[in-house]
Amino acid sequence: KYKEYVIEDLKIRQILLEKLKNAGVSDIQIERSSNKLKVFIYVARPGILIGRGGTGLDELKKFLILKLNIKDKNVLEIVPRDIKSTDLSAYLVAQSVVEQLVKRMSAQRVMNQVIDRVMRAGAKGVRIVLSGRIGGADIARRERKAAGVMPLHTLRQDIDFVSIPAMTKRGYVGVKVWINKGEVEI
């Protein structure tokens, strides 16, 4: 059963990320109990997900039930959650870097602006790595920028990490973002 659940979870994530591109999805958490499937969607713009009078949520639920072949409609529950700060979500920050690189903006400038924005939002540290044919160069290279502290060997720190490829006109550029949100209460 575990194998089927993992495949189903991947399908759910894929469908939701595809459907909610403009809503700014930063994280999708899936909880399963014996007869319930709860999907928590962390969104920057919940209005796009919910729609007028909750119609968007109902449509999304019907679409997921159809795609996943769920027989009982009460099994699936979608719970939208609002993100306090979009600049503290590594996925949304990386997505903004990707969009700017695709628009052919200078990689150095993009990294500097993003680092300033994230640090102003209240992060303890941030690190961005771009690798590939940056700026359409013939020889691939790796660019790194960091600010604040980024202790990657410490389990007490809440570090958000994501890696996303950016398809530019001259090829792929890998974008990696680490954001240190501070210490976690254990």
Task: Identify the function of each model-found stretch.
Residues 1-186:
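RNA-contacting regions in translation and RNA-metabolism proteins
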